[in-house]
């Protein structure tokens, strides 16, 4: 069976400095905002998402190690939606799109 892969939306977090204005906002919260915005821009529901891929480099807490999964669920995707992180340092975002 042939399946078509479609990228319906891409969103990123703000770029800040280490210890700057976003220091008190957990990465998983920022990522969940990104998921919600991507769903809104694509005019789709979380239950319709097949996979979630996040480019993510620095883990600040143990729960950040699976940031993509936490973000997917907290952002509105179904608990059955698979997710994975990509760590390619500066190229993480681009690798997430390619993956």
Please report, for each region that a protein language model flagged, where it lies by residue.
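Short, conserved micro-motifs enriched in small and acidic residues
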Residues: 21, 25, 29, 90-94
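Condensing-enzyme catalytic core mediating Claisen C-C bond formation in acyl metabolism
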Residues: 1-25, 37
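Short, well-ordered amphipathic alpha-helical segments that serve as non-catalytic structural scaffolds
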Residues: 28-43, 67-71, 96
